[in-house]
Amino acid sequence: MKETIVAQATAPGRGGIGILRVSGPLATKVAQAILGKCPKPRMADYLPFKDADGTILDQGIALYFKSPNSFTGEDVLELQGHGGQVVLDLLLKRILQIDGIRLARPGEFSEQAFLNDKLDLAQAEAIADLIDATSEQAVRSALKSLQGEFSKKVNELVDSVIYLRTYVEASIDFPDEEIDFLADGKIEANLRGIINQLEDVRSEAKQGSILREGMKVVIAGRPNAGKSSLLNALAGREAAIVTDIAGTTRDVLREHIHIDGMPLHIIDTAGLRDAIDEVERIGISRAWTEIEQADRIILMLDSSDPESADLSKVRSEFLAKLPSTLPVTIVRNKIDLNGEQASESEQGGYQMISLSAQTHDGVQLLREHLKQAMGFQTGMEGGFLARRRHLDALDKAAEHLQIGLVQLTEFHAGELLAEELRLVQSYLSEITGQFTSDDLLGNIFSSFCIGK
């Protein structure tokens, strides 16, 4: 017999309304014990919530959803009372006294919904993403995922792969036919079509990943180059202390901002130089750690100081120490001191923005550059949120499609192509949970809120 679980569905703390959710075959037993009756399915009933001795603990709305017409696909009882934490704890304690009832694990209600085919894995993850959304655009995209937009695109890809895989395996199973199915062009055309179809989904998923997770941008450079001033300009507030004293910033400062809906984690770091004391040395060490973990570096140069703005010196002192794959944007700051105009150009293979963090002249140029460099498109009509595991699965599927194309066009190897298509199908199915390990499911749902 399946277990019956209970948890508080509203956030802990004081509030106007507090909700307890019960799911499982004993939900009606809980209703009888607490309410004295089971409400009619999908009908709100205003009733007292009673303790074991008949004492009224609270009173409020009771809702009963009969299996399979509920969020979890099981019998569900919701008790909506007053939001005082003590009241909710007393009611929860009473329910847990009933034989066969236990406290739900984090995300267990959503896990039950997934296991009972009420929603797939991508939709279940969208619930957590909707709760954690930090912008209006993220909310809209999470709702798209919850409504099955992402899953629909993935399932269409899976259907295309299954069709092609069936065709390829049929050509292998009937080698005596006069028609050479592998050479008639149909398989290659279909395969290239799937590759293009997958690229479209990958592009949208990358947008969705940026929207969900944000991008980590580290501001680095010599002391007194204006790094903290730029952080304040981008954040729109005095987030960092700014003085004319070199080395004012000793530790890492973090700000979460949005540029036209694109979330960015902006990180201000200590000035990079030979440290003059132990505290500054620790700050510089932390700065390099942040730099190594960044999605993009903003390298600040002081345009009023010819020596510090010398690109050849910057290349040897700083750029040569970075991983070759790490994107860098060079910012020439303090143009207000020499009368320059804000501009964007390319020098030495790097995009260069000339601006004044003090007057904010050119800061909007940097904002637009970051948005473009990150590949973010404002609006994202019809977009969906995506997680890192989704991108990994799509990337692996794309890799095996390309391998399959080589097996077909260069080696005429139908058996090897069929195996690559099987792997593609497996990776895509991981996204929606059709083929997913129990360990992965545990990791995903354990990150959810209790009561979700």
Swiss-Prot record:
Residues that, per the record, bind (6S)-5-formyl-5,6,7,8-tetrahydrofolate: 21, 78, 118, 452
Compartments annotated for it: namely: Cytoplasm
Residues annotated as binding Mg(2+): 228, 249
UniProt-listed InterPro entries: G_TrmE, GTP-bd, GTP-bd_TrmE_N, GTPase_MnmE, MnmE_dom2, MnmE_helical, P-loop_NTPase, Small_GTP-bd
Q: Decide whether keyword Cytoplasm is in the record.
A: yes
Annotated K(+) binding sites: 224, 243, 245, 248
EC supergroup of this enzyme: hydrolase
Free-text remark on how the cofactor is bound: Binds 1 potassium ion per subunit.
The family database entries (CDD domains) matched by this protein are listed as: trmE, TrmE_N
Give the enzyme's EC designation.
3.6.-.-
One GO biological-process annotation of the entry reads:
tRNA wobble uridine modification
Q: Which cofactor does it need?
A: K(+)
Which PANTHER family does this UniProt record tie to the protein? TRNA MODIFICATION GTPASE GTPBP3 (PTHR42714), TRNA MODIFICATION GTPASE GTPBP3, MITOCHONDRIAL (PTHR42714:SF2)
Q: How does it assemble?
A: Homodimer. Heterotetramer of two MnmE and two MnmG subunits.
- Per its record, how is this protein called by name? tRNA modification GTPase MnmE
Which organism is this entry from? Haemophilus influenzae (strain ATCC 51907 / DSM 11121 / KW20 / Rd)
Give the encoding gene's name.
mnmE
